[in-house]
Amino acid sequence: MKVAVLGAGRVGGAMALDLARDSGFQVTVVDLTPEALKPLEGVPNLSLMEADLSDQEAVRRVMADQDLGVGAVPGFMGFRTLQAILEAGRPAVDIAFFPEDPFLLDGLAKAQGLVAIVDAGIAPGCSNLILGRLEELMSETTRFECVVGGLPVVR
């Protein structure tokens, strides 16, 4: 399966490395800046591509020969990037946590028979799965609090 990871920051880069460890995936990491891609040079099963992911047409071109798009761009770019992945006719998993309502893209995805999984990060994302599991196991959940820090600081 050909997977494009859109965004090579700390989270996107880590996801790309994890995916590249599985020989079932051919991973392409895409970012605007060579500096973001440089730490991923020479990783087996991983190719690098420079592209402006704020340009929806560029995203559609990137996705033309991919099977799955993984959105790992900053939140302010997330909605439009996800939209472009779907417009390219590809399913998507997104961790951007953008402010727009993802259900605005529901019709676009359904019209093409595509799946789009949004908010698939730590929180939201894993926290939602944990809460869902607790709901299954417990008779009643009255409160769930999840406290999550931001991205780690490189020192």
Q: Which stretches of residues belong to each language-model region?
A:
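Conserved N-terminal Rossmann-fold NAD(P)-binding element of oxidoreductases
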Residues: V3-G7
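N-terminal Rossmann-fold NAD(P) dinucleotide-binding loop
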Residues: G12-G13
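Helix N-cap at the beta1-alpha1 junction of Rossmann-like dinucleotide-binding domains, i.e.
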Residues: T33-A36, P99
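Rossmann-fold cofactor-recognition segment
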Residues: V43-D55
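Conserved Rossmann-fold cofactor-binding substructure of NAD(P)-dependent oxidoreductases
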Residues: L53-D65
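Beta-loop-alpha module in the N-terminal Rossmann-like domain of NAD(P)-dependent dehydrogenases
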Residues: L68-A84, F98-P102
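Rossmann-fold NAD(P)-binding glycine/threonine-rich loop
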Residues: I95-V118
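Conserved anion/nucleotide-ligand pocket segment
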Residues: G132-R155
